[in-house]
Amino acid sequence: MATITAKMVGDLRAKTDAPMMECKKALTEADGNMEKAEELLRVKLGNKASKAASRVTAEGVVASAVSGSTGALIEVNCETDFVSKNDSFLAFVQACVNLVVEHNPADVAALSALPLAMEDFGPTVEDVRKGLIGKIGENLAIRRFKRYGDGGSLAHYLHGVRIGVMVEYSGDAVAAKDVAMHIAAMKPVSLTSADVSADLIEKERAVAAGKAAEDAKAAEAAGKPAQSAEIVAKRIEGSIQKFLKEVSLFNQTFVKNDKQTVEQMLKAAGTTVKGFTMYVVGEGIEKKQDDFAAEVAAQVAAAKGQ
């Protein structure tokens, strides 16, 4: 039986990022053979990947890439903010967005099937993802991407790694970059009021109607006369129009000059925005709220066989 030294364990940990005890066990099982120990860990790490797959990934990063008139924006999620700063994870995300630009995959499944080799993992994006899950110890998920490649000019802006914007435009590059930064700050949902989805408008209408009903109850309780149905309808419609102005890009007040709308700024710069995409990390994902005390109590109970 080979002697397992601290240096051997340290070297294996440096290569795999596996826990120290797992590295020592693998080296012992492999009788000191580093290559065999690494393979044994890969099997264990692969099992770890399947266990992690059900865990919520509400953290992560947004990344972008542009090559000529082709560009892409991608969101890849992990479980914790700590892992979102991991160099291996960040390199994987950038490799993925570069592949989107180069190969134009139809969806996440198609992207996952593309060739990729990283850190001895591969030969596909999916294989690398699973390998990194085992290495890092968290679930990782490619959530979404958007590719632009119709020949227009592209401006992109990343606010840290949590907000990313891609703008398709013709005209002035500086104005387009300013618009990308504006979008990250003000978060419009469409170019114009006419582009806002009917579902979103109906949700806002329901909110406005609910507010009107609450006001009517308060007026009644105070002994004040109720507003006519016509006035209530006008109030609701006014709320809708205000909402549409607030969420449509061209109608928003330009963040760098409150004397102009975005539309006015673009016109003065001779620039046309054809479309945009904005990703915010974890947007719409319900993040699990852990009750630490309850979790510890459950573990203690399990240990006692209760």
Swiss-Prot record:
Residues 80-83 are annotated as: Involved in Mg(2+) ion dislocation from EF-Tu. Keywords: Cytoplasm, Elongation factor, Protein biosynthesis. InterPro entries: EF-Ts_dimer_sf, Transl_elong_EFTs/EF1B, Transl_elong_EFTs/EF1B_dimer, Transl_elong_Ts_CS, UBA-like_sf. The keyword Ribonucleoprotein does not apply. Pfam families: EF_TS. GO terms for molecular function: translation elongation factor activity. GO terms for cellular component: cytoplasm. It is found in: Cytoplasm. Belongs to the EF-Ts family. HAMAP family: EF_Ts. PANTHER family: ELONGATION FACTOR TS (PTHR11741), ELONGATION FACTOR TS, MITOCHONDRIAL (PTHR11741:SF0). Associates with the EF-Tu.GDP complex and induces the exchange of GDP to GTP. It remains bound to the aminoacyl-tRNA.EF-Tu.GTP complex up to the GTP hydrolysis stage on the ribosome. This is Elongation factor Ts. It comes from Leptothrix cholodnii (strain ATCC 51168 / LMG 8142 / SP-6) (Leptothrix discophora (strain SP-6)).
